């Protein structure tokens, strides 16, 4: 029997690579008519890269993007609030920033294309004694030893595993864009915190910079109202920024790509049912404030493949969730907190936030970094 994966995003492709390496038969279906990554830039911290190194040549992957040493966080007046590395001190490679389509191309490279079906999705899952009988939208029926929902935040597989799941709105909406620009220090990303808004920037190629811009919104506001914003109108929201923030805001009108979405998260109890399991955003979508969403999907794929190879049975999926949920919940909460801090608006609250952030001891920051960057890949290597 085969393993069926739905979703040709980062989680699904990474898992297909892991199963290929392990010699496990798999079939991947993608409901879109083509495999086309949605988004702009992406960052991979050291824990994500460690998980990827199991099936990818990192030297070749790094040639697709730009090395990332860390991120500096600034106040809206241009003064420094804090710095954060992209790896543990012992990892000399650091992190990586690149276009999403470059990461997808790397994950697709070498995969057996005959095992990937586009324009196809799961329409029915029926429990068997030692398998799941899956009917696909093309009419074919498959008896599967494992079914994996890697189909993102709007997962359809999740309706089978966890039908009562609901997304929680973060109170922020976000625009992601790519502009033609070369930072003076291309290995350092930056994020500027203003009054209810943030502006981030990361070099993703020698001549392109990824920019993300967030604004505090009320959930009851229609998304389309915020979504139809030109780069020129978007830049005007950050007119009160000084220093590096003002420099980045002036580049927004030159955007070659502009993608908009509200920031949401998913937290709950159930990732598996029988021999069906959710991974990545389908299981635990989180706000992107720590840049760990893709990393969590990659860690999921790394661990699930290893556990399944050792014990290919339904109980293994319960063990998988037990081994992952504490780490996922910690990072989800930390990311949510960062987003909430960025939403503070009044002059007094912004002053208080900036003061408190600057007062956080270096030892506390190091402990946070240790927890962030010690993923399942690092644990397996120890």
Swiss-Prot record:
Q: Which UniProt keywords apply?
A: Monooxygenase, NAD, Oxidoreductase, Quorum sensing
Which EC number applies? Answer: 1.14.13.182
Is Oxidoreductase there in the keyword field? yes
Q: Organism's domain of life?
A: Bacteria
**Any Pfam family the entry gives:** FAD_binding_3
A GO molecular function term, named singly, is: monooxygenase activity
The reaction(s) annotated as catalysed by this protein in its Swiss-Prot or TrEMBL entry are:
2-heptyl-4(1H)-quinolone + NADH + O2 + H(+) = 2-heptyl-3-hydroxy-4(1H)-quinolone + NAD(+) + H2O
Q: Name one GO biological process term.
A: quorum sensing
Query: What's its top-level EC category?
Result: oxidoreductase
Q: Which SUPFAM superfamilies match?
A: FAD/NAD(P)-binding domain
Quote the InterPro entries the UniProt record gives. FAD-bd, FAD/NAD-bd_sf, MOase
Q: What does this protein do?
A: Involved in the terminal step of the biosynthesis of quinolone which in addition to serve as a potent signal for quorum sensing, chelates iron and promotes the formation of membrane vesicles (MVs). Catalyzes the hydroxylation of 2-heptyl-4-quinolone (C7-HHQ) to yield 2-heptyl-3-hydroxy-4-quinolone (PQS).
Q: Which family does it belong to?
A: Belongs to the 3-hydroxybenzoate 6-hydroxylase family.
Q: What is this protein's record name?
A: 2-heptyl-3-hydroxy-4(1H)-quinolone synthase
Q: Give the species.
A: Pseudomonas aeruginosa (strain ATCC 15692 / DSM 22644 / CIP 104116 / JCM 14847 / LMG 12228 / 1C / PRS 101 / PAO1)
Q: Which gene encodes it?
A: pqsH
């Amino acid at each position: 029997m085969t393993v069926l994966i739905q979703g040709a995003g980062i989680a699904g492709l990474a898992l297909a690579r892991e199963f290929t390496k392990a010699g496990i038969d798999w079939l991947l279906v993608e409901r879109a008519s083509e495999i086309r990554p949605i988004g702009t830039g992406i960052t991979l911290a050291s824990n994500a890269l460690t998980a990827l190194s199991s099936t990818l040549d990192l030297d070749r992957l790094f040639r697709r993007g730009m090395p990332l040493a860390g991120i500096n966080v600034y106040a809206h007046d241009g003064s420094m609030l804090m710095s954060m590395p992209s790896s543990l001190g012992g990892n000399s490679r650091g992190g990586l920033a690149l276009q999403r389509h470059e990461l997808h191309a790397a994950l697709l490279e070498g995969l057996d294309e005959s095992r990937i079906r586009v324009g196809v999705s799961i329409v029915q899952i029926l429990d068997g004694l030692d398998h799941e009988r899956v009917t696909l939208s093309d009419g074919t029926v498959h008896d599967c030893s494992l079914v994996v929902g890697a189909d993102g935040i709007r997962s359809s597989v999740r309706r089978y595993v966890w039908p009562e799941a609901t997304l929680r709105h973060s109170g922020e909406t976000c625009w992601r864009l790519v502009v033609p620009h070369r930072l003076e220090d291309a290995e350092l990303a930056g994020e500027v915190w203003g009054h209810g808004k943030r502006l981030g920037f990361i070099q993703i190629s020698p001549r392109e910079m990824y920019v993300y811009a967030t604004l505090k919104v009320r959930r009851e506001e229609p998304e389309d109202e915020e979504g139809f914003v030109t780069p020129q109108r978007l830049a005007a929201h950050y007119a009160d920024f000084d220093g590096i923030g003002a420099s980045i805001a002036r580049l927004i009108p030159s955007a070659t790509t502009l993608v908009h979405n509200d920031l949401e998260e998913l937290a709950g109890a159930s990732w598996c049912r029988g021999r069906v399991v959710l991974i990545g955003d389908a299981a635990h979508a989180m706000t992107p404030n720590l840049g760990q969403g893709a990393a969590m999907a990659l860690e999921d794929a790394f661990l699930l493949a290893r556990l399944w190879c050792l014990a290919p049975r339904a109980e293994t999926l319960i063990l998988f969730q037990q081994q992952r949920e504490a780490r996922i919940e910690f990072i989800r909460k930390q990311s949510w907190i960062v987003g909430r801090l960025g939403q503070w608006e009044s002059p007094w609250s912004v002053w208080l936030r900036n003061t408190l952030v600057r007062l956080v001891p270096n030892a506390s920051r190091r402990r946070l970094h240790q927890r962030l960057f010690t993923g399942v890949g690092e644990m397996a290597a120890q």
